[in-house]
């Protein structure tokens, strides 16, 4: 079936917007946090008055918390809650889309699109120890998560379950090469990247 958003907006749009961001960050190392808290809240207002093709708004909230477990280095429980909502004449390419290497890993990016999306992930990260009790360069992760999408908050439909495992190799101090295998509902994804997903 043809996508109504694609039929309305096509694949080419120019959009200009103004907005604001509030951010708080107490993470020890942003690209590979072992402890701390992160909050990012933003609102962006796009309009034809700025030379764009569409009038719409995007609101986002990203909350992350990191805990050290078992009183040892390299043992971290990371959690994330993210909400994204849009209103107005939202272009096809600006709809919320899970499935990137930084959210519900395991879904195909663009397979699901809607104006609103919310998801949560909990991930355990473990770096192995050497015999001398210093951290090695290798580690593993495992995560569970899920989310939902809809045209409005009161119209969310279905649940996108998510889980996965991964391997980490430290290429620089506290900067990892990331290999992840994620599963969604009847979908699978493989990810090769640097730094943690969140």
Question: How should each PLM-predicted stretch be described?
Answer:
Residues 1-7:
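Transmembrane beta-barrel wall of Gram-negative outer-membrane proteins
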Residues 7-11, 18-134, 192:
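C-terminal outer-membrane beta-barrel translocator/porin domains of Gram-negative envelope proteins
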Residues 107-113, 152-156, 182:
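Short, contiguous acidic/charged loop-to-helix segments that flank catalytic cores in large enzymes
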Residues 181-187:
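A short, acidic, flexible beta-alpha connecting loop/helix-capping segment that sits on the rim
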């Amino acid at each position: 079936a043809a996508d109504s958003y694609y039929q309305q907006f096509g694949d080419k749009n120019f959009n200009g917007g103004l907005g604001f961001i509030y951010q708080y960050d107490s993470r020890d190392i942003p690209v590979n946090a072992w402890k701390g808290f992160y909050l990012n809240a933003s609102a962006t207002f796009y309009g034809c008055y700025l030379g764009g093709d569409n009038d719409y708004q995007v609101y986002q909230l990203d909350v992350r918390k990191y805990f050290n477990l078992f009183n040892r280095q390299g043992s971290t429980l990371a959690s994330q809650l993210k909400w994204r909502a849009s209103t107005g004449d939202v272009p096809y390419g600006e709809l919320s889309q899970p499935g990137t290497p930084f959210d519900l890993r395991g879904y195909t990016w663009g397979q699901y699109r809607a104006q609103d999306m919310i998801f949560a992930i909990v991930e355990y990260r473990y770096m192995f120890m050497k015999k001398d009790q210093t951290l090695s360069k290798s580690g593993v992760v495992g995560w569970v998560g899920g989310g939902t999408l809809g045209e409005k908050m009161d119209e969310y439909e279905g649940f996108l379950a998510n889980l996965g495992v991964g391997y980490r190799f430290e290429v620089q101090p506290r900067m990892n090469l990331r290999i992840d295998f994620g599963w969604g509902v009847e979908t699978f994804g493989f990810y090769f990247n640097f730094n943690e997903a969140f």
